[in-house]
């Protein structure tokens, strides 16, 4: 009987440790960025506005580029930059699965069109823009 109670207490303590670790990681650290720096929207805005850039500062990444069309996506390893007919662009998640290797080259991945409305790539964005989806 004592052995059963001991095992029960061990399992309860392990479960509660995991729960508190989960709560601490997901709720106590809210609002913190990687590296432990907390940045409010006002601080972010000031950092972007005070960037030493003579060209164009991308609002999503803070990078200095020649023109808005050269702004990279915030997460280039998992996003495609799709150009719209009006010259703007938007970033979408790269398609997954068997077709995903086609989208690995950032210089050409925006040109790939699977021609399948079930695969959301830049071709799909273009068709959606024209009202064909």
UniProtKB/Swiss-Prot annotation:
Disulfide bonds: none annotated. The keyword rRNA-binding does not apply. CDD domains: LCL2-like. The keyword Signal applies. Keywords: Signal. One of its GO terms (biological process) is ERAD pathway. Residues 1-17 form the signal peptide. Belongs to the LCL2 family. Probable component of the endoplasmic reticulum-associated degradation (ERAD) pathway. This is Long chronological lifespan protein 2. It comes from Scheffersomyces stipitis (strain ATCC 58785 / CBS 6054 / NBRC 10063 / NRRL Y-11545). The gene is LCL2.
